């Protein structure tokens, strides 16, 4: 955007403000200029006002205490009008006139708040008084009590206002708190501040603080001071995300998140929200031109929204329902391209997806940004194929952590509600959505040893697979494909061993989908149903049904490696390690069998000594069907939180199992006495035996929840 275009845009904004807003905006720009620039502007203004006799008359009246005192006899409407006209013309140092104003202002403010009249005019008067160089710290302290009263009065009907008229008041409010924090009335500024009429300073001047007469307003801060009261008083100020403060130009509806302000000494001046974002993020010098790209509307975090508010005829697709553009500002922010939000604010979703470098170049977008935008849009186009790839990976039984991360990133990108072009396509989609595929459920039913558990598992899996019909979805149906993948993830979560991190990530992802406008009500109902199923199964589903499925058998080798001599036992967060359970059982069984003092081959040590897998209680529990049944019944009900809620103290037992167990059984002694004992050659056979033995010990240990020595 050319400089003249920026000036024209700023002029358009300026014409739409009232006089108080114009004054505040000009002051906020003046704080960026140097002393030479400020003096030049003063000369220009004085030269243009030499022949303005009417202004001279008003200025004389504004500084005459007798005339000001006479206004108390006038009606409130006329007094407010007189104050708005004369108060800005009060000269610093005129104590008598200032006292007269300070007596009159509280009466006007009290009347306006009590009768809910002239609220806007009262806000402007309070803004003038709080930023006027003639008012001292004590004067601003006396007016400070009206800040909250006025805001409380206007907060009730604030939503009905099309513009934020309290912006100028924020400046006065912030100036008061800055003066309270810096009561010594020191500032960086001109030594001859009275001659200038205003007290302007710049961190670029590199001058020592000098006294500012009468404690009047300093217009520049040596640091980017945020517009939040609670942050005042610290050297490193931070915008608090929980507070809402408005810019002096327009309330921002941008999604720009809060940021940290550079670690600089706190100054007296105040800054607008846009100024803070521009200076804090870009780090521009203090004497930078106010119409630079860093402070232009196309560059600020909220520039796009403000530009669209000013131009009522412009189209703001960020606010249109179902446009698919609501998440564009946040998406651009994640790409560090948020300063181009205004460029996208008038585009439709289809226009954005069809952008190319030529179109961006015509909009004066830099080469690097053009390339980055085009690449990012190309990635948006590839989301449908990526979802298909994720679906295949999930069906193959891979790790769910990576697909869940991809889905979390994708849900933050712009997604538009799918609208079928004809009724045949819509009917086709409905048929595809209503066809359940029970591939995993059928396999589970055939392998399950418990018919009741298999029936429950089949029911839940079929519900999760409802969106996963075999008929491919249309290319543009991104929400439908996303929902289908969510169904696949739900299925894998139900048929595999519980993973607390994956389940938590999945539930968070569903919550985002439920609040997303791109998903239909039918899809949201499915997602909500899956959420409830995952939560329910994670809390109360029998362990046997979760362990007998094909998804768990694919992870056998990993679990066996963890059980046999692995130091990384924390990788499995669904079942307690055999060593911890075995040692716990051994402690509460008094039967003692001394082990012959002989050396064992290293093979036996790795198999037997690593986790105490072959202790007497374990063998006894494995050979006792009644005990196994009781253990399975109490496995989940004695511990409603599931195996993930086991206390971490059981891990200490694993550290003790590097030597042979002290207590063992005659069967174990017989095994030790065999001179040629070796690990079986068939790996699946030993895997099955170790797994069965580990599960038996686990179920027996968890079933005894009332025992004080239990691992629960």
Swiss-Prot record:
InterPro entries: PHAT_dom_sf, SAM, SAM/pointed_sf, SMAUG/VTS1_RNA-bind, Smaug_SAM
Alphabetical GO biological process terms: regulation of mRNA stability
Compartments in which it is found: Cytoplasm; Cell projection, Dendrite; Synapse, Synaptosome
Region spans: Disordered: 278-325
Keywords linked to the UniProt accession: Cell projection, Cytoplasm, Repressor, Synapse, Synaptosome, Translation regulation
Domain SAM: start-end pairs: 321-381
GO cellular component: cytoplasm; dendrite; synapse
Membrane-traversing stretches: none
Chain's role: Acts as a translational repressor.
Family (UniProt): Belongs to the SMAUG family.
Annotated protein name in UniProt: Protein Smaug homolog 1
Species classification: Eukaryota, Metazoa, Chordata, Craniata, Vertebrata
């Amino acid at each position: 955007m050319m400089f003249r275009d920026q000036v024209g845009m700023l002029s358009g904004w300026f014409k739409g403000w009232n006089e108080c807003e114009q004054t505040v905006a000009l002051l906020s720009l003046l704080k960026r200029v140097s002393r030479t620039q400020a003096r030049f502007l003063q000369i220009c203004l004085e030269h243009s006002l030499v022949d303005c006799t009417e202004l001279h008359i008003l200025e004389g009246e504004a500084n005459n205490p007798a005339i000001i005192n006479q206004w108390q006899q006038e009606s409130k409407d006329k007094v407010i009008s007189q104050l708005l006209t004369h108060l800005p013309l009060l000269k610093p140092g005129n104590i008598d006139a200032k006292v007269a104003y300070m007596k009159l202002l509280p009466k006007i403010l009290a009347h306006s708040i009590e009768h809910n009249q002239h609220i806007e005019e009262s806000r402007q008067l309070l803004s003038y008084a709080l930023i006027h160089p003639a008012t001292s710290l004590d004067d601003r302290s006396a007016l400070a009590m009206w800040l909250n009263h006025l805001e409380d009065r206007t907060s009730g009907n604030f939503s009905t206002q099309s513009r934020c008229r309290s912006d100028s008041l924020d400046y006065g409010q912030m100036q008061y708190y800055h003066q309270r924090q810096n009561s010594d009335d020191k500032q960086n500024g001109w030594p001859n501040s009275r001659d200038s009429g205003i007290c302007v300073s710049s961190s670029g001047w590199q001058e020592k603080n000098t006294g500012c007469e009468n404690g009047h307003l300093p217009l520049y801060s040596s640091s980017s001071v945020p517009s939040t009261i609670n942050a005042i008083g610290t050297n490193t100020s931070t915008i608090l995300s929980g507070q809402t403060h408005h810019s002096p130009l327009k309330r921002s509806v941008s999604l720009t998140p809060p940021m940290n302000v550079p670690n600089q000494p706190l100054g007296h001046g105040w800054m607008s929200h846009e100024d803070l974002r521009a200076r804090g993020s870009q780090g521009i010098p203090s004497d930078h031109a106010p119409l630079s790209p860093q402070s232009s509307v196309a560059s600020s975090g909220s520039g796009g929204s403000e530009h669209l508010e000013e131009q009522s005829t412009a189209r703001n697709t960020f606010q249109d329902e179902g446009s698919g553009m609501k998440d564009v500002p946040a998406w651009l922010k994640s790409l560090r391209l948020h300063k181009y939000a205004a460029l996208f604010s008038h585009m439709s979703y289809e226009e954005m997806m069809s952008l190319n470098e030529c179109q961006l170049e015509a909009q004066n977008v830099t080469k690097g940004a053009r390339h980055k935008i085009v690449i990012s849009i190309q990635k948006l186009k590839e989301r449908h194929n990526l979802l298909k790839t994720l679906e295949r990976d999930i069906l193959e039984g891979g790790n769910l952590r990576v697909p869940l991360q991809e889905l979390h990133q994708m849900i933050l990108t712009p997604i538009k509600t799918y609208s079928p072009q004809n009724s045949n396509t819509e009917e086709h989609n409905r048929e595809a959505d209503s066809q359940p595929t029970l591939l995993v459920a059928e396999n589970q039913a055939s392998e399950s040893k418990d018919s009741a558990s298999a029936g429950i598992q089949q029911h839940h899996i079929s519900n999760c697979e409802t969106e996963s019909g075999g008929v491919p979805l249309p290319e543009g149906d991104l929400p439908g494909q996303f929902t289908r993948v969510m169904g696949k993830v739900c299925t894998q979560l139900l048929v595999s061993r519980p993973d607390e991190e994956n389940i938590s990530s999945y539930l968070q992802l569903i919550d985002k989908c439920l609040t997303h406008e791109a998903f239909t009500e039918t899809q949201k109902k499915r997602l909500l149903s899956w959420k409830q199923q995952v939560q329910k199964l994670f809390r109360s589903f029998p362990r046997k049904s979760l362990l007998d499925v094909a998804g768990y058998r694919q992870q056998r080798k990993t679990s066996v490696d963890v059980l046999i001599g692995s130091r990384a036992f924390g990788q499995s967060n669904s079942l307690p390690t055999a060593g911890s359970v075995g040692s716990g059982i051994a402690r509460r069984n008094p039967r003692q069998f001394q082990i012959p003092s002989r050396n064992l081959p290293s093979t036996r040590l790795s198999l037997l000594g690593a986790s105490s897998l072959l202790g007497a209680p374990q063998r006894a529990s494995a050979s006792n069907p009644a005990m196994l049944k009781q253990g399975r019944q109490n496995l989940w009900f004695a511990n409603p939180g599931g195996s993930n809620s086991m206390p971490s103290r059981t891990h200490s037992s694993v550290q003790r199992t590097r030597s042979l167990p002290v207590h063992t059984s005659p069967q174990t002694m017989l095994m030790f006495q065999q001179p040629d004992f070796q690990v079986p050659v068939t790996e699946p056979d030993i895997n099955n035996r170790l797994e069965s033995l580990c599960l038996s010990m686990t179920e027996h240990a968890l079933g005894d929840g009332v025992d004080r020595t239990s691992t629960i």
